[in-house]
């Protein structure tokens, strides 16, 4: 699972997801990419599940870049605990995703293989996505 080695503050506020992604909205490494079309929180387990789905499909061909990192802690209180008594302890890590953010990139495979690999990965993610490529003008 992906998570920060250390953080300045153990607990964060929920925050709000407004607007489109300002950074990381264009292809930087690979030929093809998976871009978010909705906002949401992507869990570290979901990031890993999508990565495994892609790597199993492309087998030994190509290279994959993960462009998102879970740096926001989610807290939870134990089961059957009364309300109050402060905020719960950190439970899992999420990445805040806004529309336009490139989630994964890939190169070294054909477009058909990349499309299918990203389709399999998209089923593991809680946000809507679309396939983008450099030849369509999605480069930095």
Curated annotation (Swiss-Prot):
Please note every region of biased composition (Basic residues).
1-16
In the record, the note on similarity to other proteins reads: Belongs to the universal ribosomal protein uL16 family.
Query: Do you know which InterPro entries this protein is assigned to?
Result: Ribosomal_uL16, Ribosomal_uL16_bact-type, Ribosomal_uL16_CS, Ribosomal_uL16_dom, Ribosomal_uL16_sf
This chain belongs to the protein called: Large ribosomal subunit protein uL16
* Gene behind the chain: rplP
GO MF terms here are: rRNA binding; structural constituent of ribosome; tRNA binding
Physiological role: Binds 23S rRNA and is also seen to make contacts with the A and possibly P site tRNAs.
Q: Which SUPFAM superfamilies match?
A: Ribosomal protein L16p/L10e
Task: Report the superkingdom from the record.
Answer: Bacteria
Checking Pfam families in the record gives: Ribosomal_L16
NCBIfam families, alphabetized: rplP_bact (TIGR01164)
Which HAMAP family is this protein grouped with?
Answer: Ribosomal_uL16
Respond yes or no to whether keyword Transferase is given for this record. no
């Amino acid at each position: 699972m992906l998570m920060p080695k250390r953080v300045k503050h153990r607990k964060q506020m929920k925050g709000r997801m407004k607007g489109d992604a300002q950074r990381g909205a264009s292809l930087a490494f690979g030929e093809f990419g998976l871009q978010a079309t909705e906002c949401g929180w992507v869990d570290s387990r979901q990031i890993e599940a999508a990565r495994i789905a892609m790597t199993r499909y492309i087998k030994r061909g190509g290279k994959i870049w993960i462009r998102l990192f879970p740096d926001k802690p989610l807290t939870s209180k134990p089961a059957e605990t009364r309300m109050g008594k402060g905020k719960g302890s950190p439970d899992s890590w999420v990445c805040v995703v806004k529309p336009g953010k490139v989630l994964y990139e890939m190169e070294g495979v054909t477009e058909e293989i990349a499309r299918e690999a990203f389709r399999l990965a998209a089923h593991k993610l809680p946000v809507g996505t679309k396939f983008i490529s450099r030849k369509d003008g999605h480069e930095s």
